[in-house]
Swiss-Prot record:
Annotated metabolic or biological route of this protein: Carbohydrate metabolism; galactose metabolism
Residue positions binding Mg(2+): 130, 162
Amino acids binding substrate: 34-37, 223
PROSITE patterns: GALACTOKINASE, GHMP_KINASES_ATP
Protein name: Galactokinase
EC number: 2.7.1.6
Main location: cytoplasm
Keywords: ATP-binding, Carbohydrate metabolism, Cytoplasm, Galactose metabolism, Kinase, Magnesium, Metal-binding, Nucleotide-binding, Transferase
GO biological-process terms attached to the record: galactose metabolic process
Top EC class of this enzyme: transferase
PANTHER family to which the protein is assigned, alphabetical: GALACTOKINASE-RELATED, MEVALONATE KINASE/GALACTOKINASE
Native species: Salmonella arizonae (strain ATCC BAA-731 / CDC346-86 / RSK2980)
Amino acid sequence: MNLKEKTRALFAEVFGYPATHTIQAPGRVNLIGEHTDYNDGFVLPCAIDYQTVISCAPRDDRTVRVIAADYDNQVDEFSLDAPIVTHDSQQWSNYVRGVVKHLQQRNNAFGGVDMVISGNVPQGAGLSSSASLEVAVGTVFQQLYHLPLDGAQIALNGQEAENQFVGCNCGIMDQLISALGKKDHALLIDCRSLGTKAVSMPKGVAVVIINSNFKRTLVGSEYNTRREQCETGARFFQQPALRDVSLEAFNAVACELDPVVAKRVRHVLSENARTVEAASALEKGDLQRMGQLMAESHASMRDDFEITVPQIDTLVEIVKATIGDKGGVRMTGGGFGGCIVALIPEDLVPAVQQAVAQQYEAKTGIKETFYVCKPSQGAGQC
């Protein structure tokens, strides 16, 4: 039974009438452009065929009832006429409540909803299960009540909910790609203007995500340190963000900067340039150049931004040794563990899976998780 069938069946069973709509919003993987988003730079993610699915129907009152199929059918119920506050014990409820609360501040022309939620985006793997949930909930209200909100506004609403209601400081990329993803395409996103450009993916190429299953510990504190170092760099150049600094300007005065800050700045500037070039390499179907850019990105994250760990580097090396110049591989996400992403010709996927299975656990003592994905459509009815 797929997620649509599962949520529709549970909806009818619990609520006693059929759902009128089923909505999906996908998770995502970032192909290149790491730690560039909060520097007003460029990112190149694609939506993946793992998603949050919600079967739903409008109510004729002001109550919102929610069932979380993946949490033993836990229930949340709240009124649109009372202040929406955080739930004491159910963290998943806060994503739903936060989205609804922030929607009310944007456009209050909606009533109650019944919904059943289920998803298969792996949690804690850096594939944006939370953004997928936020965008799915926003799309439910937009579709059921014909709200005049576009995908970018639904994405911004989700980001606001996560920043202000849930209390997690995230950029806009995850929600934007979940809302605006396009089948068989990646999306070049300008994180300053929120402008997007669809980039077609070469035919016969698989998007492979491998979770190192190395438990991330430093990610919060180190992430904040990196942001501060980038802001220090921007101040040195008297610019609002590193987006506004050229590599030439940096190279001319790099020796005057604190050496650690200089390394951080060099990563962001070079990564921005790589990301824009990667979009054009992908569009031309030049997988060899894309592979070189991904390798440079990984080396920059490892040596200049210093956010990889030995387990991640090992995983990247195993994949690279298997695919040679026929594809690309790099760490993806915030760093200090998490996942790697690889673009691999479909006929090489079994060889990569076998090499990783034989070598990674033997070298690190940890068993990986392997996902083969397709670039998928953003949020909407399913």
